[in-house]
Amino acid sequence: LYLAFEILDYALLSAPGAPLKKALIDAGIGKDVSGSFDSGIYQPVFSIVAKNANVEQKEAFISTIEDTLRKIAEEGIDKKALRAGINYHEFRFREADFGSYPRGLMYGLQLFDSWLYDEEKPFIHMKAIPTFEFLKEQVETGYFEELIREYILDNPHGSIVIIRPEQGMT
């Protein structure tokens, strides 16, 4: 799931023409829409963020996300976007370019993503090539659509967080 949700985040919210981002912006919800997947914790979190949205749009935000994801789960996600997401993340993995951060430090932090919660598999994220191959094989099978259904649409655990700025408190 670690990489699969990174791919879903890319295809749904980051890629050019990403359908979930487009649906929220077309509905006038927020000026900037983004997503993230935090997998370095025991219970991973998939977030959808609409910046500069009105509090009154909360229900529209929820229904737009649910309706769009149901449609995508039923009709299928754009296969080109999935392949692009896989290629993007595989390229980043193979290049191992961490900018100004020391490579060893970044590898150590990657190890913690699994090692903290499964002492038997500290290197699982370092050996990702088979996972990329698996994900490529799953593009045409409905695997990603099932992830949307199981882990987002049919998941009873979720939250809506509204952060309101207070004028003059910058």
Give residue spans per PLM region.
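Amphipathic heptad-repeat coiled-coil/leucine-zipper-like oligomerization helices
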Residues: Y151-N155
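Active/ligand-binding-proximal structured segments within catalytic/core domains
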Residues: Y2-L12
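Extended non-catalytic domains of envelope/secretory-pathway proteins
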Residues: T141-G142, G168-T170
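M16 family metallopeptidases and their MPP-like homologs
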Residues: K21-K136, P156-M169
